[in-house]
Structures are given as structure tokens and as C-alpha cells.
Amino acid sequence: VDAGQPAETATTPSRKKRGPKRKDPPGTPKNKAQRNFTDPDSRIMKNSDKAFIQAYNAQAIVDGESQVIIAADLTNKASDVTHLPDMVKQVESNLDRKPRELSADAGYFSEKNVTFLEKRKIAAYIPPDKQKHSASVEPPPRGRIPANLSCKDRMRRKLRTVRGRKTYALRKQIVEPVFGQVKTVQGVRQFLLRSKLK
């Protein structure tokens, strides 16, 4: 230790400043990324138990009167929001007509989807937010619809109307029994074939 310098600075070696951390180029898989060699079309998705599994995302539209599946698809994209337009087009193709109204859960809400349905003159009942079972029920809106409402706020308002509540409440009575029938009675809880093609 040099007598002319304080002890802490005398023992600290000088370091060069380092540059920014190296970044991997876009599209580079993470170090722990894995690939499924038996079914490369499938993707890792979160299931209803919040566990991550190798899976596909099954889509279905059910007719409200007959409780028959009128459109179905299997995708490897976890998010539901991008599938709504293709599913509606499939209904139109299968039935040779368009539906009058459509109810879906919050996973399908986007301004793009609502606009798509409005252009086709299909009444949409899709909550922009996940519905909480314990949420207090707000009174139905009164008066004219304010012109400056966002798409989300217009949909929230529509779902608070008497017709909106009634229509959206039927969604579970229409769709869930069909899924229950497929899973429980027919025993279809998983797909036994590999790849989207099959």
C-alpha cells in the first residue's frame, strides 16, 4: 500500500468498462428450448390445470338451437383470438348462410374480431375482460350510446343490457354440454393421432 493513497483505492485494480451484453439474433431458440420429434406440429400449451403440456388447441362453434357442432378446427396456436374469423367463415361455408349472433368467451375478444363481425352484420357478445363469478351485477345502461366509447367499452355496455346478459348467459348452456358430451360420454379427452394433417 502506497502511503500517499487511501488503502481502498490502492488495492482496487483498474477495470475496463465492458460493452453491452451480447444478444442472440431474433428467432434464436432459448437454451432450454425443446422440440417434439414425435409430433413436431404440436406446441407446448398451458392446460386447464395450469400445467404445460404438448398439445393442440381445439376450436368449435356450436349451434344454439340444436347444440350441434357446426364448425371445428385444430390449431397449434395457444391463443383463441386469431381463430374467430376463420371459424365464422367455416360456419358460413358449412351452412351456406351466416349466423345472426355469436357469443364467445373473453379469449376471442379483439377490436379486429368485433369489426369483422359487425361488417358481416353478426351481433357479437364477447366480453373484453374475463368474467369473474363474484363480480357484482351492474344495472343495465340507460340512454343513448355515447359516441366516444371505445370498442371495449361499447362491448362492456352491450353485455350489461338485458338482451346482452340474457344472450351471453346462454353461451355456457349451449357450448359446455356439448364439450361435456364429447369428453365424458364419447371419451374424447385427447387426440390419438399425430400431426395436424391427420
Feature annotation, model-predicted:
Residues 1-198:
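Anion-binding and metal-coordination hotspots
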